[in-house]
Amino acid sequence: MDRRKFVKTTLAASIAASLPILTACGEKAKVATEATASIRGISLDGVELELEAAAIRELGDALSGPVLLSGDPGYDGARMIWNGMHDKRPALIAQCLSSEDVAQAVNFARERSLLTAIRGGGHSWPGKSVCDDGLMIDLSQMHNVEVDTAAKRAYAGGGALLGNLDDATLAHGLATTAGVVSHTGCGGFTLGGGFGRLNRKYGLTIDNLLGAEIITADGKIRKISAEEEPDLFWAIRGGGGNFGVVTQFDYQLHDFDRNILSGMIVWPIEQAREVLEFYAEWSPGLSRELYAGPMMATMPDGTSVIGIEVVYNGDPVQGEKELVPLRAIGKPIDDGIKMQDYKVMQTQEDAALAHGVRSYAKNAMVGEFTQGLVDDMIDAFIADPRAAIFTHTCGGAVADHGETDTAFPHRNAQTMLVFFTGWADPADDAIGKKMCRDWHAALDSHSGGYYDNIEQEGDTGTAGNFGPNYDRLRSIKTQYDPGNLFRMNSNIEPA
């Protein structure tokens, strides 16, 4: 069984067939907002407020893209985000086509202290890219990616998806670290840090971020980099969406052969101890070219399995040599590691994490893959087709940076554990959340913090998670967003 088949026969098979695949709205012509009456809104502090019809019309006239109200054509499609569990209704949606549009929308929200959510790819697991009764600033039409092959740089719009980035760069024999689900937005993914199958060789996505364009709470359009407003540039590399709306990301690219040694080896769950104990001993010595991470899941027929996903970003002959010990472990159901198009790997999770899935996740940054962690992973395993645990392998180039070099502090983690549940029926919401929380709680003693893109209620406080970077982040937040307009995130409150 190869990796694609494995994924599609586990979580995806039980849920994807019954779910609508929601896609971003197509290009829209300019639509004048015809607000004829005031509408209800909600302030940053949760107080009901009135949004006057004239002000809404003025915003609509100022934007090159449409402003959508409840009942308008396109409103329901625009408000829906990836995670089907979050069904919220903004008072209005500003569908921006330019940085100037974003600045107008930010000014509108700030002047009214209006609750504001930023939708890039709409892939926020906890649903923070949409809000009830506030303003959604929708960047989904700003999805263009341009590649400068001579400079080996990519310029991605704030609404670009990781699939857009991969498509644009791979076409030129170039790549950078991107995530594992192609319909994830570049925006939230990058601002949180950015884990992917190439991070051991190239570092996190933020380590490949050379610059950005951001609209801060004062409505100013800023170009930032290590040379221009370096404190703000430092903060967005791991500090999330706390500091403004990023409308362009400038990425460093690397020469890359998309025909790559990759895939998964799968064993019966009964061999989990042998596999995980081997991995715990083997993984600290991996070369930077080798990304290898375990996962555990149950298929719809009740068969539980453990797998290790592999991507070797280098000479495949050397890669085969490095994989010899892995292939000697146990009696696998299937060895699906082979030469294949990297895009196959980058899209194989898309079905299991399809648009409309009702989903919940928690995560843990783990400093060392210990025997105790192995024991707890086995003891806590939930044999349910709606649940799975994935890992993202760190080390290598991720650890080349110190914990204060960027806002993302977890540089010494060996692994990130991601606990995921997905289901179709709203009646399963409670059990879906409980399974995920219980699994996470059983392994939480091994955690050194969390990846804030997957933050959920009840997670360790933001101050503790950012550790030595928190005070600096709070100072920068106070400078650029003193009113905490951008709070729909893993929030850092201004001083």
Task: Please state what every model-predicted region is.
Residues 2-495:
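Soluble FAD-dependent oxygen oxidases
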